[in-house]
């Protein structure tokens, strides 16, 4: 007899996972082993360490849910239902069992009563019949899968790894005798063509977003297009969904405040309308796509092509508005260029006597306009005429007025001759001869420069002779009055002028809109401020007699003509109207006295300094002699600029 070895080898006792697995058991009934702790899988002892010596064999302690016997599932359920009691080991394992979506939906163990009514047994037999039918269908499903070349659930490949045996899909394919379309997508059989869709989307972006061409528009009238200038494609771009919402809002006003009865009536109306809405809508254009052509298209009704560009046609109202704006801009430009507030500030300033006078021709127009002007500013500044009116009543001032008029008549032919500002008159008329000396010095300087004007020199000598005789008599009277005990003039506060620059420095034009500059004096520049009372001053030009030699003085006096008569003086007064102003500008525009920078009339205590000593020489200037001389230039300048601006304003749109 052949010897048969009936013992179990060590390999078979340890590795019998594949042989013990039942093929008929459904994968839905299995629990996965991976990820479970030893106590959850029914193992109560930790495994011993592997050593070289032989380790005794212990049967594996696995819960009943992991044991796959060759018996059917229906027989196991019959045994469980027939058993009157449950073993304690099964209770422990059932409590430890994890509930998952893939776990078997068995009734809880131990809950069935030992004695069951016949109705329950009939129900169980019906369930068994249903399960048998499912298994038969399972076989059909398996056969169909095999024919289709698909891998069935019962088909096991010998290359399955432990991971594939223990882990199943969480959402397995539903069992069905019919082949679903998605089961045929991944076929391994080459004989059967795969029913796969192309993963690459063949539809282009243009086709996907294309909505179709709109319906042709009905004919429109031209007046409608002109009346509504908004293009129609902007109005058509609204989606019908938004328009429907607006209609609903209009149809259902004050819905929040309505009563429940009104709500019910409204819902019934909507239900009546709903059958019409269920109909398939006709293919409508949802939204009009904005193409490049439409974005760059300009309608010839609203745009005109001019100079290579499309310009929007303006209405009559817009054209009138534009023309008015242009006219206003031209008017402002003309006023701002020729007569501005800055020029007015320059004209009204107290320092405009520092500016250049006009020529002989323009000065006549200046004086004539000044006499004719009715402006309050010019009347207030025109104190020279006021002094001439008072000449008859005040004999003390007559000499100074005569001097100014004579000098102006004599200087008609000398517009470029440098002169000094008018000398202030003291409280008493004892030093009126200082002005005569200045005129002598000025004549001497002009002779040295090479300007030979004999006729003018003869006229000046005549005037000097007459002035010397008048000044000697007035000086004697003034000295006697001062010796007898006259009142000294009250000293005044003087301002310390600081050098400041303004926009008038080189920007403000004089006559004919050209800047005229005056050359500085030969021996130096003018003082920046007037001398303080009681202090000796250094003359800019030599004005003392000891500077000249006696021979020069005798030669100069020998040239003096006889004194003119009263008639000649009156005729010279009439000629003075055509002469330039008596007091010309001295220095340049950069002179500190002119750089007021708008600080006139502003009281600053830190700029005032008290006089250091009281003396007979004071700065209490005579108002008529100083203000009249300075206002003459301002009056002439203001009147000329103002008259020119008025003429330009009148002739702006053409002479009428």
From Swiss-Prot:
InterPro entries: MDM1 (IPR029136). One of its GO terms (biological process) is negative regulation of centriole replication. The gene is mdm1. Residues 243-257 have a biased composition (Basic residues). Residues 111-126, 398-409, 466-482, 625-638 have a biased composition (Low complexity). This is Nuclear protein MDM1. A motif (ST]-E-Y-X(3)-F motif 2) lies at residues 204-210. Keywords: Coiled coil, Cytoplasm, Cytoskeleton, Microtubule, Nucleus, Repeat. The keyword Nucleotidyltransferase does not apply. One of its GO terms (molecular function) is microtubule binding. Residues 309-337 form a coiled coil. PANTHER family: NUCLEAR PROTEIN MDM1. It holds the Pfam family MDM1. It is found in: Nucleus; Cytoplasm, Cytoskeleton, Microtubule organizing center, Centrosome; Cytoplasm, Cytoskeleton, Microtubule organizing center, Centrosome, Centriole. Residues 1-126, 208-264, 386-504, 550-589, 614-638 are annotated as: Disordered. Microtubule-binding protein that negatively regulates centriole duplication. Binds to and stabilizes microtubules. Residues 68-82, 434-465 have a biased composition (Basic and acidic residues). One of its GO terms (cellular component) is nucleus. Belongs to the MDM1 family.
